[in-house]
UniProtKB/Swiss-Prot annotation:
Positions bound to ATP: A18, M19, S20, G21, G22, V23, D24, S25, L44, G136
Site (Interaction with tRNA): H137, Q355
CDD domains recorded: MnmA_TRMU-like
Alphabetically ordered keywords of this record: ATP-binding, Cytoplasm, Disulfide bond, Nucleotide-binding, RNA-binding, Transferase, tRNA processing, tRNA-binding
Cysteine pairings via disulfide bonds: C112-C213
Entry protein name: tRNA-specific 2-thiouridylase MnmA
Species, as recorded: Rhizobium meliloti (strain 1021) (Ensifer meliloti)
A GO molecular-function descriptor: tRNA-uridine 2-sulfurtransferase activity
Gene encoding the protein: mnmA
Amino acid sequence: MNSLDFDRKPEDTRVVVAMSGGVDSSVVAGLLKREGYDVLGITLQLYDHGAAVHRAGSCCAGQDIDDARRVCETIGIPHYVLDYEARFRETVINPFAESYIAGETPIPCVACNQTVKFADLLATAKELGADALATGHYIRSRPSPKPRYAGQRALYRPADAERDQSYFLFATTQEQIDYLRFPLGGLPKSETRALAEEMGLVVAKKADSQDICFVPQGKYSDIVSKLKPNAALAGEIVHLDGRVLGAHEGILHYTIGQRRGIGVATGEPLYVVYLDSRSRRVIVGPKEALETRRVYLRDVNWLGDEELEAAAGQGFECFAKVRSTRRPAPAVLKSDAEGLYVELVEGEAGVAPGQACALYSGTGEDARVYGGGFIRRSEREPAAEAALKALLQAPAAA
């Protein structure tokens, strides 16, 4: 077996590397070339507009494409650029804006992986005769430990917990996992940068990408307002107890858990606890009203060994992440008449619809990824949940 788990020599194994123009994917290409693989680099042009072209911390824009080209020249592999701008707008940017208007907190990186990168680019890699598509994600995959799943691969958290990207890859299907390879899963980021220096890559000191790639300076409301100029509709700011505290200029300017910049002064610390898109109300309350114990899921991608229905029906003990920056915490996957849900044993504050809930076998670097789903709705502590339901049943002021 070679290092990518193929039963052939590296020189007889063709690998397409998804190159964003950053240090991680560049090192992947360099490592595979060094090992003797037949490597092709492909960069997707996803957008190339105005300030985004030269904005530090972006990805897949003009400067990044040029950096990827220079890296490929340095290591001696072919480089191709594919224009996926229309596809990216259709499947990632527009749904992002629509989700925000609906009062959700979307994760466009998951949509990008599942539509553009792991669907379209993966299909292109196969058309080019590649045996695998390699990326610079910090996650591990290896052959399934179960004999009954021989030939399949499983996902695991990476060695560098600070760089763990498994949360954004929970929706990766089994077919995609079997074709993908993640050479950086066993490396710390510091070693990746050291390798880039050693290889003489122009991106060795390049800053990591930050925030959402198509959102300048992380101002989500700006991109939503630009795409949906009529979406910023005014409404009320309402306390959980029913008091109308003020007015707002559009729920797209708020997120669940927000405290600063709410626009009301009451002498008590208030947080955004719910965004009522139907009645255009921003509902606020005390911090304890953010505490979430249960999240209902949609679009679940299950990677466990048991059948999903059987596992949830019995109560499947696992660990869950509802934010990319948190460690997996104890949870139980269950189901009822409404559908699949996850009980968060220790609770979590400020969980919003649209976020992901990724499931794991444990908390360590070798924990297996069981998949997950998008949060459809969450349930708070009983008192806050009852107050919210009563408020949502009451009509908003005209």
